[in-house]
From Swiss-Prot:
Protein name (database record): Lactonase drp35
Superkingdom of this protein's organism: Bacteria
Subcellular location: Cytoplasm
Cofactors named for this entry: Ca(2+)
């Protein structure tokens, strides 16, 4: 009889020695991001990276509602205003310069979208929380000035979320896909024929091929090309000019990159992720006219700060609606 001391034994080594081990994607091209700017020494839930026509970076802090403005050249950080709505989650910029801010409200039924100037003035309700039940996490404009948004409701066994399209006059809301679990990140391909959506609590990536009207799904056009692993799941995303998709992995301290067909082709790691630091990676975004990618993350669980990191992506960022 073999003694317990002589039995085969599992040890924490190699990949299993990480707080957030990478197994299925370990053979992908992998790079580690460099620190770019510390937003705060406090752990803030940073989100919503977006650049305006002048190249200024806007982002926000979900739980405290701070709207930040960063000058990429001087690294000066300003706080032009604080959201009057609870739990803002994304900033997108209209061609007219206004900030469109998605907010989650009570995370159940009081989310919406409001527009404001970069100083927080001239507030206009776009999707009003009092007349809808959406919990809006993110949005993306098309070239006509309409937009798609994600409904962040539900959980893994109660999929209440979905994706909707709002016409350029902001008067008509059309469902695109429904019955998904916490719809989160959203991106539109360069030709506006493919909509990408991340489903956080089900760990799935949706690829939705659209007809010319932008709301009808092509026959067999709604597919799930990728299932993620680990806790927590896919978050916000963006595309580059080659139609590659960059998906931040919340709770994992990394960004996964997919080609236009949904195959993983690379990943970007946040420093110290193996030790459990800076795992709350939420949003990648390109500096306009370059292939330089900015990624936000924070270290709330480890009592650390809030950072922006940077790498070069595969291609230059897509020239989105606010630059057209």
């Amino acid at each position: 009889m073999m003694s317990q001391q002589d039995l085969p034994t599992l040890f924490y080594s190699g990949k299993s020695n990480s707080a957030v081990p990478i197994i299925s994607e370990s053979e992908l091209q992998t790079i580690t991001a460099e620190p770019w700017l510390e937003i705060s020494k406090k752990g803030l839930q940073l989100e919503g990276l977006n650049f305006d026509r002048q190249g200024q970076l806007f982002l926000l802090d979900v739980f405290e509602g701070n709207i930040f403005k960063v000058n990429p050249e001087t690294k000066e950080i300003k706080r032009p205003f604080v959201s009057h709505k609870a739990n803002p989650a994304a900033i997108k910029i209209h061609k007219d310069g206004r900030l469109f801010i998605c907010y989650l409200g009570d995370f159940k039924s009081t989310g919406g979208i409001f527009a404001a100037t970069e100083n927080g003035d001239n507030i206009q309700d776009i999707i009003e929380d009092l007349s809808t039940e959406y919990c809006i996490d993110d949005m993306v404009f098309d070239s006509k000035g309409g937009f798609y948004f994600t409904d962040f409701r539900g959980y893994s066994t109660n999929p209440l979320g979905g994706v909707y399209y709002v016409t350029p006059d902001f008067k008509t809301v059309t469902p695109i896909i429904q019955n998904i679990s916490v719809a989160n990140g959203i991106a539109l391909s360069t030709d506006e024929k493919v909509l990408w959506v991340t489903e956080t609590t089900a760990n799935r990536l949706h690829r939705i091929a659209l007809e010319d009207d932008g709301v009808t799904i092509q026959p067999f056009g709604a597919t799930i090309p990728y299932y993620f692993t680990g806790h927590e799941g896919p978050d916000s995303c963006c595309i580059d000019s080659d139609d590659n998709l960059y998906v931040a992995m919340y709770g994992q301290g990394r960004v996964l990159v997919f080609n236009k067909r949904g195959y993983p082709i690379g990943q970007i790691l946040i420093p110290s992720r193996d030790e459990g630091h800076m795992l709350r990676s939420t949003h990648p975004q390109f500096i306009p006219g370059t292939n330089q990618l900015i990624i936000c993350s924070n270290d709330i669980e480890m009592d650390g700060g809030s950072m922006l990191y940077t790498v070069n992506g595969f291609a230059k960022g897509h020239k989105s609606y606010q630059f057209q």
